[in-house]
Amino acid sequence: VHESCGHGFAKLNDEYSYEEMGAAPEGLIEQVKLMQELGWSANISTTSDPELVPWAHLLKDDRYKSGDGNGFQLTVLEGAGTYVKNLWRPTDDSMMHNNGYGFNAPSREAIYKRVMSLSNGSPWEYDYEEFVTFDQAHLPVNSASTRTPLRDDEQQDFFDKEEMRKLPRLHSPIFTGERIPF
């Protein structure tokens, strides 16, 4: 879901970081800004200013101030796009951070925009209130239904890099050139 829906479909960026990556270089920050002009990477920011992050409108909306049914509290946290510094994310955890929880509000908004623009074509125009109505109607009733609290002895990061390196490499997909009938 993280890879195919998050990256592939909604064009979201990673919300996790690796200590060894350090600060995002200026060239990458400029690339993120360009991607955002094209509608990509709506879930990360190149600034920590709550007035300027891509999800600023959600931060100002009372309907998102107390968190949502997924248990996500919107904020501005440093560490995203695999870098510890210079890129910010909207929540402490999410599908694009740990791959174990649902999508946060900025990610859900990006998914909504993509689905609606592809399904309705060029006459469709984004309406924030229509998104919020749809989003609020489809949230779980409470966070207990979607998030299982970790025990104190459980590791927070689901993907330990050293353990991942021990796994066998998967084969590349084989393309036959044949059309798949639908």
Describe the role of every protein-language-model region.
Residues S4-E20:
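Catalytic Zn2+-binding segment of zinc metalloproteases
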